[in-house]
């Protein structure tokens, strides 16, 4: 049993062979599906990687502009504008909604930002001076937050896809290099054992047939000998009967001769 460690420990029967063939077919189909899934995820992963790179570049430019804008606001207002902004906020103008996107069976969380144009709690902020700079900073920071939300969504998807792709590739490699070869070796082992059993069965049936033929030939030979003995006994009986008949006939002829002699003596 060479290579017994590279196959499953099963009893070689035709039922087991059918089970192993079904398992091999399932493994091949699973390998094909996982391979396509890995390719689809890898394609999406590369797209997300490119988008993350673009978003980071955009984020750098936006945050630089926002920093200059905030400096302009502080220069124009001349006081602590952040305190006024915090006191002016009554309702959330900027909201973030989360949803899930299905990519080849993998659910990726995505974040969408929404701006409620009906809410404007900063219209009276810095009304005395610096109002224009405040509105400009508000727009720039709104774009910065949108970019941050987009970047957070992309990076979350990046982390999840990276882990899922690694797991999928490990499964693909395990099926390709372990499960399928082991199942094929098991099928080859079962086929070899079944062929060996078929040859043994054929040899056994051949021997049984030869024994039957020898027994039939011996029976025919015994029957022929018995028949020959019976025929020989019949011939001996017939010869003996013929001999006895000849003896009786000879005795009768001798008696007749003696009687004739006696008749001649009387005359």
From Swiss-Prot:
GO terms for biological process: vacuolar acidification. It is a peripheral membrane protein. The keyword Lipid biosynthesis does not apply. It comes from the Eukaryota. GO terms for molecular function: proton-transporting ATPase activity, rotational mechanism. Pfam families: ATP-synt_D. Gene3D superfamilies: 1.10.287.3240. It is found in: Vacuole membrane. Keywords: Hydrogen ion transport, Ion transport, Membrane, Transport, Vacuole. InterPro entries: V_ATPase_D. One of its GO terms (cellular component) is fungal-type vacuole membrane. Subunit of the V1 complex of vacuolar(H+)-ATPase (V-ATPase), a multisubunit enzyme composed of a peripheral complex (V1) that hydrolyzes ATP and a membrane integral complex (V0) that translocates protons. V-ATPase is responsible for acidifying and maintaining the pH of intracellular compartments. V-ATPase is a heteromultimeric enzyme composed of a peripheral catalytic V1 complex (components A to H) attached to an integral membrane V0 proton pore complex (components: a, c, c', c'', d, e, f and VOA1). Belongs to the V-ATPase D subunit family. This is V-type proton ATPase subunit D. It comes from Candida albicans (strain SC5314 / ATCC MYA-2876).
